[in-house]
Curated annotation (Swiss-Prot):
NCBIfam families: leuA_bact, PRK00915.1-3, PRK00915.1-5. Mn(2+) binds at residues 13, 201, 203, 237. The lineage of its organism: Bacteria, Bacillati, Bacillota, Bacilli, Bacillales. It is found in: Cytoplasm. One of its GO terms (biological process) is L-leucine biosynthetic process. SUPFAM superfamilies: 2-isopropylmalate synthase LeuA, allosteric (dimerisation) domain, Aldolase. PROSITE patterns: AIPM_HOMOCIT_SYNTH_1, AIPM_HOMOCIT_SYNTH_2, PYR_CT. SMART domains: LeuA_dimer. This is 2-isopropylmalate synthase. Homodimer. Belongs to the alpha-IPM synthase/homocitrate synthase family. LeuA type 1 subfamily. Pathway: Amino-acid biosynthesis; L-leucine biosynthesis; L-leucine from 3-methyl-2-oxobutanoate: step 1/4.
Length: 518
């Protein structure tokens, strides 16, 4: 059976989702989970786009050992050089170069002729091949490119040294038959096509990204580019979990499969959802909360008699299992450590002690600790930079039906250890909290989005708050988790501000290095 390579673009195309702003620690956490999932290639970012992205890609490339790490680059020597510097220490460095090929892009964006685009594509593939053992070349907007011209340029970049050819449906325009036909046409009209792997990259603007990806496989694609939970530009990318399970369950139809560890899908989905702040719809295939729920009486009756009557996928296949162990205030260190191991976390004794102390503090507020609670607890500690910005200390809010909500907040400036306390009022309790935080922080901050959701079921479930703010005109997002909604709201606000302060600090450092170098 044919093996399909899985090229995950959660950290590059996925992070381009509106409102998503991952820091380097969060990107590394996702990359490590993608490695556990068993993807073949991780597209870690766009190294030339910013100093922060460069450093994140570099750290991921140096850390990940069991899959290839790649970065995106325009057909520009500076982009290729930046990608090489970021990726050269990786296990199997590769680059992903792109240039638009459709007439609409050539005319309105590139202002180039077809011949000029061909020359540039060939030149940049040759340049990249001098450094990278594997060069992937993408024809941006291939779906709206005339097939004879697409075949011409594909043939020439293969001769120039490309190892993988990506034919993306950049705007999610094609039907499955139309998209599959592009791969069939390349197989039939490009003489040297057998020297490369063909890759599919589909967007979901018309809701056909997964179907188009499967059609590409049926017509010769060797690699699928996708993102966890289908996140990405506009309506998103093809959902990795849907393609992977479709190949596994229906390999009789597709005659192909991946080598993913499917039992890691649910955990990966949850991690990406938590860190990006993009909630997974309850009815989302494979990983949604309702994916394995049966409510209709007729369905329940059949399911109880024989699961296969209404269930084509077992929950265990994708890592959806009932908690084998309920943790609470009387749970010991051994049970706690065992649960962390089950969840895929490996820590030394000092880290176990630190997290166990945090766990015990949580049990004083919450009767039963779920897997989601543990994951949230650990992630907040692992991915937060505690050297820059403000640390939340305490919050007190007075409000009632006949009172003006008043909040008092205590913070610590983590750079100079200065303690600060302020109070302010607001039209509501959340506004009072944010007005108070605004008085503590000497920045022009504006709240542009606020969302709240429960971590799971139950009256004592942890609250998760996601916010988007502008800090001195620069957009940033943040999240906070606590049992109290107002505390979670305060932490989310500070998290967003601190993220921007970290970015500003990195940028200032880069400017100083540049000034010294010049």
């Amino acid at each position: 059976m044919r093996k399909i390579n899985v090229f995950d673009t959660t950290l590059r195309d996925g992070e381009q989702s509106p409102g998503v702003n991952l820091n380097s620690r969060e990107k590394l956490a996702i990359a490590k989970q993608l490695e556990r999932l068993g993807v073949d290639i991780i597209e870690a970012g766009f190294p030339a786009s910013s100093r922060g992205d460069f450093l994140a890609v570099q750290e991921i490339a140096r850390t990940i050992k069991n899959c290839s790490v790649t970065g995106l680059a325009r057909s520009v020597k500076g982009d290729i050089d930046a990608a090489w510097e970021a990726l050269k220490d990786g296990v199997s460095p590769r680059i992903h170069i792109f240039i638009a090929t459709s007439d609409i892009h050539l005319k309105h964006k590139l202002k180039m002729t077809r011949e000029e685009v061909k020359e540039k594509a060939v030149e940049m593939v040759k340049y990249a091949k001098e450094r990278f053992p594997i060069v992937q070349w993408s024809a941006e907007d291939a779906c709206r490119t005339e097939l004879p011209f697409l075949a011409e340029i594909v043939e020439e970049v293969i001769d120039a040294g490309a190892s993988v050819i990506n034919l993306p449906d950049t705007v999610g325009y094609l039907t499955p038959d139309e998209y599959g036909n592009i791969f069939k046409y390349m197989k039939e009209h490009v003489p040297n096509i057998s020297r490369v792997k063909l890759s599919a990259h589909c967007h979901d603007d018309l809701g056909m990204a997964v179907a188009n990806s499967l059609s590409a496989i049926e017509n010769g694609a060797d690699q699928i580019e996708c993102a966890i939970n289908g996140i990405g530009e506009r309506a998103g990318n093809a959902a990795l979990e849907e393609i992977a399970v479709a190949l596994h369950v229906r390999n009789d139809a597709h005659q192909a499969d991946s080598s993913l560890n499917l039992h890691e899908l649910k955990r990966t989905s949850d991690l990406v959802s938590k860190l990006t702040g993009m909630a997974v719809p309850r009815n989302k295939a494979i990983v949604g909360d309702n994916a394995f729920a049966h409510e209709s009486g007729i369905h329940q009756d059949g399911f109880l008699k024989e699961k296969s009557t209404y269930e084509i996928i077992s929950p265990e296949l994708v890592g959806v299992t009932a908690d084998a162990l309920v943790l609470g205030k009387h749970s010991g260190r051994h049970a706690f450590k065992d649960r962390l191991n089950t969840l895929g976390f490996q820590f030394d004794s000092d880290e176990i002690n630190k997290y166990f102390t945090m766990f015990k503090e949580l049990t004083e507020k919450k009767k039963e600790i779920t897997d989601d609670d543990l994951i949230s607890l650990i992630l907040e500690e692992k991915v937060t930079d505690k050297k820059i910005g403000y640390e939340f200390l305490s919050l007190q809010v007075h409000y009632g039906t006949s009172q003006v909500p008043t909040a008092t907040v205590s913070l610590k400036n983590q750079e100079n250890e200065q303690l600060m306390q302020e109070a302010a009022t607001g039209a509501g309790s959340v506004e009072a909290v944010y007005n108070t935080l605004g008085r503590c922080i000497d920045k022009n901050i504006e709240l542009t989005d606020y969302r709240i959701q429960s971590n799971r079921k139950g009256e004592d479930a942890l609250a998760q708050v996601f916010v988007r703010v502008t800090v001195n005109g620069k957009e940033s997002s943040g999240r906070g988790i606590a049992q109290d909604v107002l505390e979670a709201s305060a932490k989310a606000y500070l998290n967003a501000v601190n993220r921007q302060l970290v970015l500003d600090c990195n940028l200032d450092g880069l400017k100083r290095q540049t000034a010294v170098g010049s």
